[in-house]
Curated annotation (Swiss-Prot):
InterPro entries: Formate_THF_ligase (IPR000559), Formate_THF_ligase_CS (IPR020628), P-loop_NTPase (IPR027417). ATP binds at residues 65-72. It catalyses: (6S)-5,6,7,8-tetrahydrofolate + formate + ATP = (6R)-10-formyltetrahydrofolate + ADP + phosphate. Pathway: One-carbon metabolism; tetrahydrofolate interconversion. The keyword ATP-binding applies. Keywords: ATP-binding, Ligase, Nucleotide-binding, One-carbon metabolism. SUPFAM superfamilies: P-loop containing nucleoside triphosphate hydrolases. GO terms for biological process: tetrahydrofolate interconversion. It comes from Streptococcus agalactiae serotype V (strain ATCC BAA-611 / 2603 V/R). This is Formate--tetrahydrofolate ligase. One of its GO terms (molecular function) is ATP binding.
Length: 556
């Protein structure tokens, strides 16, 4: 079979202006970036706010293998299949980060015959959103350091600057650096570091802002440092929120592209799901809901991370809550959770499927706690056997959850027709009674305890020495009513990536909190989660090249 990029390059794309006509978007409503990419105008976003809100489908997954379980591919294939059965559908996805694209993923725009296009553009520079976010983040760093250098009127303690620079690459050498070296004209020397762009609070802010004025307000509320008397220093204290908003004035507009089958797609924003909230922009999802009858969106990594954050952090900012949740599972991942080594995942092992099913079962039960109907989608691989598939279907039937096979990677929309029909039937016959896991008035400790005990299945929460000091500090600063964004490994319900399946006898330790007061949530750091990834021994970049005619190769 052709590679993903070969399939993508074989498709005759339609002009994006033609694609978006099917959802009522005219030529004057878009700002073109070439023939096949566009941004949606503010006027159109405002104009559709009075329109009826469609049905929202959230795609999530079980705890993944390192290769991922195909959420983006399944989301795209499901949207194409829904369109094929007569449902007016759009898709709302995150933008890929160039770091993982060049590192381990090699591309993140779906796969096989379920892709968003133009695939090369989306995976590389797209409409420049990542660069604008990087620029805004680093402009803040430059202006902050300049304030300290030019007299430090706010009495900023340079030992307590918490704002980091960013770059959209995996570069472990930049995790800890010292800036201002050389001479007094180079600024005040201090410790600093780089995060990857998608870990920037500005990315999270962009994805939660509801309009330009809300973006500016959120930017103004970013905490960047503390003064010598431990008072938080905000962007608004530096009086630079206007400049940062100016840099991002076009970035906030959602990007329009298409799938292989011509389904309109809004691809916008891309915060990490293990260290941020892991969902595409509120603006893109909200606008899609007013343009289409059905909207398919996804949340990063497993349901314990991305879906929990979608439901507890993003959903309160949307015009509606999910009408159905689709949990993507693969037999290889279930076998891994059942104790099979990575090298043996292609071998039939029905007993391992049974053992690993506990992971899927917990995710199903967790999503049901939110009052939303659940469907399981089995992302089919050629190594899957009839016995394994039959076993998984029986196990799903035993817990009364709808389940369908899907082969959208290989067969495109046709491979997702049964799944699409089942999802549509569930939405039409079962009501969603969404409720959050915790209340805003709960303390930070109470919110984390509910997440750990009700979603992860853990026993207790321990707070390290630094976290204990911060709990009082955050309460004194009035930050304790914000939602919690848990930063932990994506591979396990616990904070130990090697504890697979559905563990129960474990505790979670929160070592530190990070205030994301602009985004409007508090990050709780557990385990060894990194905000700047490193590259593997053989990065995907080694297989990438460009031919003399400009054709890209190696993007998987």
């Amino acid at each position: 079979m052709k590679t993903d990029i070969e399939i993508a390059q074989s498709v005759a794309l339609k002009p994006i202006a033609e694609i978006v006509e099917q959802v009522g978007i005219g030529f004057d409503d878009i700002e073109l970036y070439g023939k096949y990419k566009a941004k949606l105008s503010f006027d159109k976003i405002e104009a559709v706010k009075s329109q009826k809100v469609g049905k929202l489908i959230l795609v999530t997954a079980i705890n993944p293998t390192p290769a991922g379980e195909g959420k983006s591919t399944m989301s795209i294939g499901l949207a194409d299949a829904l369109n094929k059965i007569g449902k007016k559908t759009m898709i709302a996805l995150r933008e890929p980060s160039l770091g993982p694209v060049m590192g381990i993923k090699g591309g993140a725009a779906g796969g096989g015959y379920a892709q968003v296009l133009p695939m090369e553009d989306i995976n590389l520079h797209f409409t420049g959103d990542m660069h604008a976010i990087t620029t805004a983040n680093n402009a803040l760093s430059a202006l902050l350091d300049n304030h300290i250098h030019q007299g430090n009127e706010l009495d900023i303690d340079q030992r307590r600057v918490i704002w980091k620079r960013v770059v959209d690459l995996n570069d472990r050498a930049l995790r800890q650096v010292i800036v201002g070296l050389g001479s007094p004209v180079n600024g005040i020397p201090r410790e600093d570091g780089f995060d990857i762009t998608v870990a920037s609070e500005i990315m999270a802010i962009l994805c939660l802002a509801t309009d330009l004025s809300d973006l500016k307000k959120r930017l103004s509320n970013i905490v960047v440092a503390y003064s010598r008397n431990r008072k938080p220093i905000y962007v608004k204290d530096l009086k630079i929120e206007g400049a940062l908003t100016l840099i991002l004035k076009d970035t906030i507009k959602p990007n329009l592209v298409q799938t292989i089958y011509g389904t309109p797609a809004l691809v916008h924003g891309g915060p990490f799901a293990n260290i941020a909230h892991g969902c595409n922009s509120v603006l893109a999802t909200s606008t899609a809901l007013r343009l289409a009858d059905y909207v398919v969106t996804e949340a990063g990594f497993g349901a314990d991370l991305g879906a929990e954050k979608f439901l507890d952090i993003k959903t309160p900012n949307l015009p509606t809550s999910p009408d159905a949740i689709v949990i993507v599972a693969t037999l290889r991942a279930l076998k891994m959770h059942g104790g099979v080594s990575k090298e043996d995942l292609s071998q039939e092992n029905v007993e391992a499927v049974k053992r690993g099913f506990t992971n899927l079962e917990r995710h199903v039960n967790n999503m049901r706690q939110y009052g939303v109907p659940v469907v399981v989608a089995i992302n089919q691989f050629t190594a899957d056997t009839e016995s394994e598939i039959a076993t998984l279907k029986t196990l799903c039937s035993n817990i009364d959850v709808a389940v369908e096979l899907a082969s959208v990677w290989e067969d495109g929309a046709d491979g997702g027709l049964e799944l699409a029909q089942t999802v549509a039937n569930v939405i039409e016959t079962q009501s969603s009674n969404y409720k959050r896991l915790y209340n805003d008035e709960d303390t930070i400790e109470e919110k984390i305890k509910k997440i750990v005990t009700k979603i992860y299945g853990g026993n207790k929460v321990h707070f390290g020495p630094k976290a204990q000091i911060q709990l009082k500090e955050f309460s004194d600063n009035g930050w304790d009513k914000m939602p919690i964004c848990m930063a932990k490994t994506q591979y396990s319900f616990s904070d130990n990536p090697n504890l697979l399946g559905a563990p129960t006898d474990f505790d979670i330790t929160v070592r530190e909190f990070v205030p994301k007061t602009g985004a409007g949530f508090i990050v709780a750091l557990t385990g060894d989660v990194l905000t700047m990834p490193g590259l593997p021994k053989k990065p995907a970049a080694l297989n990438m090249d460009v031919l003399e005619d400009g054709t890209a190769i190696g993007l998987f």
